[in-house]
């Protein structure tokens, strides 16, 4: 988009409770639905999410009643501890103490400005891995910025490392305190308010490429080419023969990058 501030990109809804004491807060839901072109679809999605959460709640209660609270919470703690132990070994085996560097670029922001550099350094300090984005370009006046939450980046790293190096590791957030993420304020990945953010997914794709470039340096067998990164978004809308508004939205994903074992598959999600 050509937005220069986040206020130009739509209504900002802060975290709100849609249910309080198991009672739906209709005014909150209606506020969201009234800002949607397809409120019926969105209400259906919302109802599906609520049904899934109620099922999960029921299953947790069943486990706690069957095994007792102490056993249930002890099991949760053990799952977190098991993940942390496995990730600690993985970090020690795959991340060197010497700094590794990798950078990639967003070629253009859609308004003719760019390229924008995303740079990251990675190294191990005792049992902790450090990711430092110092050297990343300053925030843009366009909407290409991506406010990267440090905890979210840890999740990205954990999924990547487990899937690439040891898929047998059970995934949860037990390893989070084994990672430290440093993102300088005022950069493309931590812009100051009121920076526009609506085209942030272009930076997200580059972050995965940077992560792959960093981890692949330590083990060339897992080094892969760059991914497709940018995704075209297709919107189809209009009025059907009954005069009802319709809207279809599709994201076109590209191919998976090649690696030492062979070529990656072509476009896989069109």
Label the predicted regions.
Residues 1-270:
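Glycine/proline-enriched, intrinsically flexible loops and inter-domain linkers
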């Amino acid at each position: 988009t050509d937005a220069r501030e986040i206020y130009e990109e739509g209504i900002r809804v802060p975290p709100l409770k849609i249910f309080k004491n198991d009672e739906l807060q209709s005014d909150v839901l209606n506020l969201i639905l009234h800002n949607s072109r397809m409120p019926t679809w969105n209400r259906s999605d919302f109802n599906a999410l609520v049904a899934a959460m109620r099922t999960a709640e029921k299953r947790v209660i069943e486990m706690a009643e069957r095994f007792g609270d102490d056993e249930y919470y002890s099991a949760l703690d053990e799952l977190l501890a098991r993940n942390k132990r496995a990730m600690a070994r993985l970090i020690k085996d795959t991340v060197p103490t010497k700094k590794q560097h990798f950078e990639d670029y967003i070629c253009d922001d859609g308004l003719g400005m760019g390229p924008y550099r995303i740079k990251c350094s990675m190294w191990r300090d005792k049992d902790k891995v450090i990711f430092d984005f110092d050297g990343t370009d300053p925030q843009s006046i366009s909407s290409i910025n991506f406010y990267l939450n440090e905890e979210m980046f840890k999740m990205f790293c954990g999924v990547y490392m487990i899937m690439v190096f040891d898929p047998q590791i059970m995934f949860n957030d037990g390893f989070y305190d084994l990672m430290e993420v440093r993102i300088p304020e005022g950069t493309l990945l931590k812009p100051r308010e009121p920076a526009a953010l609506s085209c942030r997914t272009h930076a997200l794709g580059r972050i995965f490429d940077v992560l792959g470039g960093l981890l692949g340096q330590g083990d060339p067998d897992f080094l892969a080419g760059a991914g497709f990164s940018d995704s075209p978004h297709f919107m189809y809308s209009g009025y059907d023969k009954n005069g009802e508004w319709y809207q279809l939205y599709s994201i076109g994903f590209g191919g998976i990058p090649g690696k030492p074992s062979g070529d990656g598959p072509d476009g896989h999600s069109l």
